[in-house]
Amino acid sequence: MSWQKGGYVDLIVDYRNSYLINHISLHDFEFKGIKNDYEKKYIELEIKKKSAETVPSSLSFQDVLYYEMTCCKFWGSGHHIICCNLMDTTNIYDKLLRLEQVEYAKSNSIDRSPMNLLEFIGVEIWLNSGDKLKVICKIFEFDDFLIWKVFEF
């Protein structure tokens, strides 16, 4: 088996292929900033690979149900991503359900039906400062994702 660099594509992850989150390598990407559109339930992270020739990329979260980020620099100064993982959402759902905010919330669908929490995924991004971003959303998108082709010999 051999690996060959393919092309760049937009990677879109939802609950059906959420396992891909654990296979995304964002190690050493520089975290440049965050944008939040509250009305659209949309968050975008601007990131940039260390190499100078790489243009900035972005990670976006759509249909955001929940997010939190620490900015304490627990491990000292730093703004590079260490890892991106699929996150267990159980504790956060428990907290929200105790407040009865999610259970009675309506989706943005035409019929205003109750939310289906099974359609949401949890994503956790660690920075080398020790800070962490947690997001629960329906869609996670990474533009300019490098695809590697596998060849059998």
Listing of model-derived features with the role each one plays in the protein:
Residues 2-153:
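Surface-exposed, interaction-prone regions used to assemble/regulate multi-protein complexes
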